[in-house]
Amino acid sequence: MSEDRLSRSGDGNKILYCSFCGKSQREVRKLIAGPSVFICDECVELCNDIIREELEEKSQSARSSLPKPKEILEVLDQYVIGQQRAKRTLAVAVYNHYKRIESRHKNDDIELAKSNILLVGPTGSGKTLLAETLARLLNVPFTIADATTLTEAGYVGEDVENIIQKLLQKCDYDVEKAQHGIVYIDEIDKISRKSENPSITRDVSGEGVQQALLKLIEGTVASVPPQGGRKHPQQEFLQVDTKNILFICGGAFAGLDKVIQQRCTEAGGIGFGVKVKSSESKRDVGKVLAGVEPEDLIKFGLIPEFVGRLPVVATLDELDESALVKILTEPKNAITKQFKKLFEMENVELEFRQDALSAVARKALKRKTGARGLRTIVELVLLDTMYELPSQEGISKVVVDESVIENKSEPYLIYQTMPAKVASGE
């Protein structure tokens, strides 16, 4: 114990002093002892004030940096083509969610409820991309979970708590950051229960998972092992509060449009002025989905309690040929721009003719994979060229047209010394 922090009074008793401000134990209310040091109650209060001020400054900085709904929509427009209705819904919901978090620091009688989001739309319509773009814009941790791999605790498969463990991994186990992150749960429609009536037998990958997710998405303190899973039961668990984590659930919900049609037919018509015919177009299906009600989701197989915890529902349209062509060329990280960049690294210009773009879009529509299939098609078409190109010299340009996409010819190679089109095999 340091001598300058101790002295003796006339009666022989030791007088203790605060190691920080130097006041004696007689000048303060409380002196707390540590290893070779002491701290008084006044210094503790001062430390608390300093920390509180820093937290308030951070909170004010976060408030000023939170983008407005219009700003969120502008960024989404740069990466996601179409889906204006869904993007506007998401922009408002995300803005309100983070405003709600800020309001919790204020002394207010009104507590704002949490609004998680459900995205309904066909495969490849942009559900995952929307969630990823939002997380990148807001600079918060983001993770994707597959609902089909989840099971109830005690069964083979992933616990729902593993979702939070993945989120922690994304931010190097910074609990505070994770508690303000975004979780996207994909294929949520695949955990619908098998019938509308409550199951008598155990449904560990359907209704059981929905029950397990209830508390997590509503807000609970989840105990998460740093190393994950059930394999290390003796580890010290991290406590993560999920009440401020934004959960976005997405699924294709194939057949949901028929459930909506049936409800509207029984009610004597369909809302939003949509008339459903047997020869209904894909665009009409999108309009039908836009009229989804909680009762439709319950009939589809989601339990009422789960639907109640996803109050914001955004529907996405199936992409047509025109939208797919735009996706190929317009976004900031468009597929054609990425491949052009790759070829540029070899000092070669890559050109996609308009008929080639339309052919790629038609192929993707036939495969029913939406925008997700576009990259695969372009990758296969250019594979041999990308294999040969680094070994060849004198090539200045590669041209792709409709015949190339339809596998009727190879990409056209234009040489610096030979301006005419020459097939790549020659």
UniProtKB/Swiss-Prot annotation:
Q: What are the record's GO terms for cellular component?
A: HslUV protease complex
What CDD domains does the entry give?
Answer: RecA-like_ClpX
Instruction: Identify the residues that bind ATP.
Output: P122, T123, G124, S125, G126, K127, T128, L129
Could you tell me which Gene3D superfamilies the record lists for this protein? 1.10.8.60, ClpX chaperone, C4-type zinc finger domain (6.20.220.10), P-loop containing nucleotide triphosphate hydrolases (3.40.50.300)
A Gene Ontology BP annotation from the UniProt entry: cell division
UniProt-annotated binding residues for Zn(2+): C18, C21, C40, C43
A GO MF annotation of the entry reads: protein dimerization activity
> Start and end of every ClpX-type ZB domain?
6-59
Q: Which InterPro entries match?
A: AAA+_ATPase (IPR003593), ATP-dep_Clp_protease_ClpX (IPR050052), ATPase_AAA_core (IPR003959), Clp_ATPase_C (IPR019489), Clp_protease_ATP-bd_su_ClpX (IPR004487), ClpX_bact (IPR046425), P-loop_NTPase (IPR027417), Znf_CppX_C4 (IPR010603)
Alphabetic keyword roster: ATP-binding, Chaperone, Metal-binding, Nucleotide-binding, Zinc
Subunit structure and binding partners: Component of the ClpX-ClpP complex. Forms a hexameric ring that, in the presence of ATP, binds to fourteen ClpP subunits assembled into a disk-like structure with a central cavity, resembling the structure of eukaryotic proteasomes.
Q: Which HAMAP family match?
A: ClpX
Which protein family is it in? Belongs to the ClpX chaperone family.
What this protein is reported to do is described as:
ATP-dependent specificity component of the Clp protease. It directs the protease to specific substrates. Can perform chaperone functions in the absence of ClpP.
What is the official name of this protein in its record? Answer: ATP-dependent Clp protease ATP-binding subunit ClpX
Q: Which organism is it from?
A: Xylella fastidiosa (strain M12)
